[in-house]
Amino acid sequence: MPRNSITIFTGLALAAVLFITASAASEDLSGYNPTYSMGSEDKDWWTDYPNENPNPGASVDHPSWVLQSLKEKPVIILLHSASCKSCAAQMKTLSQILKTYRKDITYYNIRVDSNDSRGREAFEAYDPTGGSNYVPTTIFLTEFKDTMGKTSLAWHSYEDAMSESDVEAYIKDAIYYYRQSNGGGA
């Protein structure tokens, strides 16, 4: 085989290996049972405002950039400030866990003490207690198909730093529910 052909063949083989490796990087959730269910209690996934909100059961006006992102995969939004110690802890936790799940999640890291209007929009839409604007606030969003086959947007938000196990559970749930609602297996 001529030298140029070997180089091209080697390059194609390497590209195929990289593609297969990247494709296999998605987390396998076959046999996974979600940690949190749909509902209106504190740790549940919500489709409307939860019981702790001043408007329990009211519909959420989801920002357009969130809806656009959810067309691809589940979303995590971290709202934080530069001078917040618990924000730094939450960023570290998310950074560590996203090493495993980054391919399956769209992540927004938004400083609320900047001029990014998405922070205000996210607080308005996803503050579980309505109006406190506490940081850090971590928001998990996914699609969910109910027993009648209707797909809804489900979300959960948490004010303060979270344990690594809770963050990972919400991420895995989000990926699982998203895949189930979009016809894919876990």
Please report, for each region that a protein language model flagged, where it lies by residue.
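C-type cytochrome heme c attachment motif
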Residues: 81-89, 136-139
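Solvent-exposed loop/turn segments at secondary-structure junctions
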Residues: 81-86, 112-117, 145-147, 160-164
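Short active-site neighborhood of thiol/selenol oxidoreductases, capturing the structured segment around
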Residues: 67-82
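Thiol-based oxidoreductase modules, predominantly thioredoxin-like and allied folds used
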Residues: 60, 79, 103-120
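Typically the conserved alpha-helix immediately C-terminal to a functionally engaged Cys/Sec
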Residues: 65-66, 88-101
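Extracellular/periplasmic catalytic domains that process cell-envelope and extracellular macromolecules
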Residues: 69-71, 102, 128-134
